[in-house]
């Protein structure tokens, strides 16, 4: 199999920054993982230099086998009951005004880890009541009860990524369901209309423009408020290959289309990831809350 050469627009220049070391030290201090590190995010240095990070809770081993993802697969460890407190302390130490919490998928747990998410939200609110909280959740096998546990803890944004277009699910997300992911987003709005919902799509996996636009329409029909669109980068030769490096102009086309169908916030670009510059939604959240 031949591999595509990365275009210039995907090349990143890394600058030394003391703030990056500070973030790494704080994460070590509280024994926390970040999806930035586990998923080899290309924006890790930019985000760490701004003292932002996406916390990865419930361990670093996933029970699913998505072919695009670099997070470890296998048998997960027992939940750490102190983790919600440690996350809250790290948020305080970093002085975050906006925090994103995500997790591996824990199909081994009765509620998929929903109660652990809820406890993390409550712990942060107790320590940093003015910090906005975004949670990027797994599908919880489509459990309304599990989604309710998270929503009832009152995060500001509940995100769940569809990741790719429907046709590619069997080869990219074999243990997931496109319809179920859309249903999760619908559930959030059914439980609490005031909570913002968000999703993310990767491109370059072999989809067409029309399929991406159809996925965006499906998200809007599920009342999704925010969306991110980014280039898929294969972690290794053992993962799903990159079929295409999508030109920045196409990302702009997707952004314009997403805005035209009603998304309140759109991030679309080659290096965009689901939590990239998530703090930019803070003003939108605060302005809508005032209405």
Swiss-Prot record:
[4Fe-4S] cluster 1 binds at residues 36, 41, 47, 275. The keyword Translocase does not apply. Keywords: 4Fe-4S, Cytoplasm, Iron, Iron-sulfur, Metal-binding, S-adenosyl-L-methionine, Transferase. Disulfide bonds: none annotated. GO terms for molecular function: 4 iron, 4 sulfur cluster binding; lipoate synthase activity; metal ion binding. One of its GO terms (cellular component) is cytoplasm. It is found in: Cytoplasm. It catalyses: [[Fe-S] cluster scaffold protein carrying a second [4Fe-4S](2+) cluster] + N(6)-octanoyl-L-lysyl-[protein] + 2 oxidized [2Fe-2S]-[ferredoxin] + 2 S-adenosyl-L-methionine + 4 H(+) = [[Fe-S] cluster scaffold protein] + N(6)-[(R)-dihydrolipoyl]-L-lysyl-[protein] + 4 Fe(3+) + 2 hydrogen sulfide + 2 5'-deoxyadenosine + 2 L-methionine + 2 reduced [2Fe-2S]-[ferredoxin]. SMART domains: Elp3. It is an enzyme of class 2 (transferase). Pathway: Protein modification; protein lipoylation via endogenous pathway; protein N(6)-(lipoyl)lysine from octanoyl-[acyl-carrier-protein]: step 2/2. Binds 2 [4Fe-4S] clusters per subunit. One cluster is coordinated with 3 cysteines and an exchangeable S-adenosyl-L-methionine. HAMAP family: Lipoyl_synth. Belongs to the radical SAM superfamily. Lipoyl synthase family. This is Lipoyl synthase. It comes from Caldicellulosiruptor bescii (strain ATCC BAA-1888 / DSM 6725 / KCTC 15123 / Z-1320) (Anaerocellum thermophilum). The gene is lipA.
